[in-house]
Amino acid sequence: MTISLGFVVAEFNRDLTYQMELLGREHAEFLGATVKETILVPGVFDMPLAIKKLCQRDDIDAVVTIGSVIEGDTDHDQVVMQHAARKIMDLSLEFNKPVTLGIPGPGMTRMAAHERVDYAKRAVEAAVKLVRRL
C-alpha cells in the first residue's frame, strides 16, 4: 500500500519553508510515500482550514504541516504556535487521521530556523509511521 500524504505549507518565511518542503518531498519518496496534494497558506496560523480540507479526503492518509515560527519583538510567535499546535492536534483527533507537526518554533532566531529545516523530514517520517502502525 502506498501512503498518500497531503502537505500544508506556510508561505511566511518561504525561504525556509521551501527548503523544508523539498526535504519533506524527498523523504516521502525515500519512504515509499506519495505527496498527493500541497496547499500553500499564508502562515502557520492559517493552516487549520487547509488541514481540515485534506483530512476530509479519502485519498489522503495523513497530513504533514510545514512552517517556521521565528521570534519577533513581541510574544506573537508564542501565540501563533500555541494555537496552531492545539488546533492541529484537535483536527487529527476529529478526523482520526495523522496530522504531524513540521513547524519549529517559537522562540527561535532566523539562524536557528535554518538549522531546523530537517523538521519537515521528521514530520514526514512520523506521518508514515503513524499510518503504518494505526
Swiss-Prot record:
Enzyme class: transferase
GO BP annotations listed: riboflavin biosynthetic process
Reaction(s) catalysed (UniProt annotation): (2S)-2-hydroxy-3-oxobutyl phosphate + 5-amino-6-(D-ribitylamino)uracil = 6,7-dimethyl-8-(1-D-ribityl)lumazine + phosphate + 2 H2O + H(+)
Catalytic residues, chain numbering: H76
Annotated pathway: Cofactor biosynthesis; riboflavin biosynthesis; riboflavin from 2-hydroxy-3-oxobutyl phosphate and 5-amino-6-(D-ribitylamino)uracil: step 1/2
Entry-linked NCBIfam families: lumazine-synth
Keywords associated with the record: Riboflavin biosynthesis, Transferase
Pfam families xrefs: DMRL_synthase (PF00885)
Name of this protein: 6,7-dimethyl-8-ribityllumazine synthase
EC number in record: 2.5.1.78
Record's GO cellular component terms: riboflavin synthase complex
UniProt gene name: ribH
